[in-house]
Regions:
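The conserved 3'-phosphoadenosine-5'-phosphosulfate
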Residues: 38, 48-121, 127, 131-134
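PAPS-dependent sulfotransferase catalytic domain
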Residues: 1-66, 70-73, 77
Length: 134
């Protein structure tokens, strides 16, 4: 499960932190960082890396819940940003929708707390707030 994967990752992180054989340049630690579930959710670091090459104005960052809640408004924002004519996309049915077990409340709280400082940095960078903790 997702919860099991996160718990296993936290154990690996603790082993890496507490074992003197693991240094930051250790390949196992670096591989962990590359394949980390948690690290991939720290969007601010990835966006900052891209902003070394592109200006802030060259990014349009929108939450997917806006796409799900109001597809026409969402697409209008995208078309306006791209300076292209607004048009209606006919086939907007969601494809390959999976079934997911509801996230355990304690795991959700952990994730909200874990990502809070990173998301605050993101919101400050983007000058925009997303309601991810609700």
């Amino acid at each position: 499960t997702f919860e099991d994967a996160i718990k296993s990752e936290l154990k690996r992180i603790e082993i890496c932190k507490n074992n003197p054989e693991y240094k930051i340049n250790n390949n196992d630690f670096n591989n962990h960082a590359v394949f980390s579930y948690l690290r991939h959710g720290i969007y601010v670091d990835f966006i900052k890396a891209w902003m070394k090459f592109f200006t802030k104005e060259q990014f349009l960052i929108l939450p997917t819940y806006e796409l799900n809640n109001n597809r026409k408004k969402f697409l209008k924002q995208v078309f306006d940003y791209l300076n292209v004519q607004n048009f209606e996309i006919k086939d907007v049915e969601r494809q390959n929708v999976g079934e997911y077990k509801k996230l355990d409340k304690s795991m959700r709280k952990f994730l909200v707390d874990y990502y809070r400082p990173h998301n605050e940095r993101l919101f400050k960078l983007l000058e925009k707030n997303f309601d991810w903790d609700k």
